[in-house]
């Protein structure tokens, strides 16, 4: 393995690749305000557009270099990766444009962070580049936005708290999105479309996506914990006594988030436990209409997944592109500022102790909040080497930099608190 990179070995600490896209611009803006003395460059296909973006950023960004790089030109990606310690990328859908950059970073020993919500892209990244990244010392970290930081880091925080208390391994663990305001980004929709397109074209891909452990290192050593449905219909009281009266529905992002969390457990040598079970739900409230809303939403979600994963290929591409948000577009600043999310994760440990982790953040989850999360992942990889794990390869946020992110969250406006319930 290569020796850890030092600042003197690379020209830049962070390169923001895709800075002309909507979330790319937001991420660059966040780094211009929060990055301090970090050496940052902007990269993409069009130097003119990158210069225009740079002009909209704060004074600290006006000297940031501009790099030309294109997924269609592997040599440009290789050059970019060789010049920086970390690349953060918002260029998606990742199944179309992501692997050449993963390859460049894995070869150069360069750390990488993205926003992908595409399970099969992550699976291919693992299969093709995990070993090489281990050998070169690169950390290839997927899922560094709303997909799947709140899920991944909430469970990691619970693990750390239970470990500190000597309360034993985590058992049944349930994430519940309690509050949410904001839109789904065009990039997230594009990722979902790519997943549906791939699964409807290939039954083997569909079977892999249905496997709860499709992203783990060694499928053969995963425990048999029985059915683990992705979009369950559950009453709140069946999750935790504190949720009595609340009704929930399946959370669409669970199809991806749950796989990331289970991969974290595997990468951390099953630190959460061999009997760790994980599921996600979304609250629909406690009103008189909530039971009906819960049942209808759950049926609708399962129907969308079942039909989309089998028949999406029959929809004309132009029709789909006309009716969904386009990647690179997004809401107004006022809308982004008004958004928020709050999620609670409940767990019961092997000793019977019960814990709750609550994570919350102001800002539209798909845009402002995601840009902060991605920016903080880039800063953690570049600056907090002493707090990163010893793992290299294709990783998750918790496995790569769980402790570093826990330390960074408060200053970034992300609250993540754990309490013991019993």
Where do the protein language model's features map onto the residues?
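C-terminal catalytic/substrate-binding lobe primarily of soluble NAD(P)-dependent oxidoreductases
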Residues: 2-7, 160-422
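Short, conserved SAM-binding/catalytic segment
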Residues: 53-62
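Conserved glycine-rich Rossmann-like NAD(P)H-binding loop of the short-chain dehydrogenase/reductase
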Residues: 36-49
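Conserved Rossmann-fold cofactor-binding substructure of NAD(P)-dependent oxidoreductases
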Residues: 67-86, 90-96
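A short, Lys/Arg-enriched amphipathic alpha-helix followed by its capping loop at the start of a domain
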Residues: 30-37, 268-270
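Glycine-/Pro-rich loop/turn segments that contact NAD(P) or position catalytic residues
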Residues: 93-213, 263
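N-terminal Rossmann NAD(P)H-binding glycine-rich loop of SDR-like oxidoreductase domains
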Residues: 12-33
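Structural motif
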Residues: 13, 85-86, 111
């Amino acid at each position: 393995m290569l020796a850890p990179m030092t600042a003197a070995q690379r020209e830049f600490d962070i390169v923001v690749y895709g800075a002309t896209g909507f979330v790319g611009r937001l991420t660059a803006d966040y780094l211009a305000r929060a990055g301090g003395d970090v050496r940052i460059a902007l990269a993409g296909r069009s130097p003119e557009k990158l210069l225009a973006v740079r002009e909209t950023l704060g004074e600290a960004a006006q000297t940031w270099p501009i790099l030309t790089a294109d997924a269609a030109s592997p040599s440009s990606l290789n050059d970019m990766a060789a010049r920086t310690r970390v690349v953060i990328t918002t260029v998606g859908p990742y199944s179309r444009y992501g692997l050449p950059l993963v390859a460049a970073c894995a070869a150069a020993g360069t750390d990488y962070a993205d926003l992908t919500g595409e399970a099969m892209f992550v699976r291919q990244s693992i299969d093709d580049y995990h070993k090489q990244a281990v050998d070169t010392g690169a950390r290839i970290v997927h899922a560094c936005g709303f997909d799947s930081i709140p899920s991944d880091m909430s469970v990691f925080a619970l693990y750390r708290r239970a470990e500190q208390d000597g309360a034993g391994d985590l058992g049944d663990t349930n994430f519940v999105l309690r509050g949410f305001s904001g839109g789904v980004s065009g990039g997230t929709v594009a990722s979902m479309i790519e997943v549906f397109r791939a699964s409807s074209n290939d039954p083997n891909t569909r079977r892999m996506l249905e496997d709860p452990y499709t992203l783990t290192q060694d499928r053969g050593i995963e425990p048999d914990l029985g059915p683990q449905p992705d979009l369950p219909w559950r009453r709140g009281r069946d999750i935790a006594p504190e949720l009595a009266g609340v009704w929930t529905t399946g959370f669409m992002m669970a199809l991806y988030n749950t796989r990331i969390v289970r991969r974290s457990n595997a990468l951390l040598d099953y630190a959460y436990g061999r009997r760790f079970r994980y599921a996600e739900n979304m609250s629909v409230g406690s009103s008189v209409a909530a039971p009906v809303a819960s049942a209808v939403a759950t049926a609708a979600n399962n129907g969308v997944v079942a039909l989309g994963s089998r028949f999406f290929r029959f929809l004309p591409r132009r029709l789909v592109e006309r009716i969904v948000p386009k990647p690179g577009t997004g809401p107004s600043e006022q809308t982004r500022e008004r958004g928020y999310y709050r999620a609670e994760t409940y767990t019961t440990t092997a000793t019977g102790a019960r814990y709750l982790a609550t994570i919350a953040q102001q800002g539209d989850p798909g845009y402002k909040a995601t840009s902060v999360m991605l920016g903080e992942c880039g800063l953690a990889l570049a600056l907090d080497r002493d707090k990163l794990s010893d793992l290299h390869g294709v990783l998750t946020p918790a496995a790569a930099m769980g402790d570093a992110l826990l330390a960074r969250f408060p200053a970034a406006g992300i609250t993540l608190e754990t309490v013991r319930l019993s």
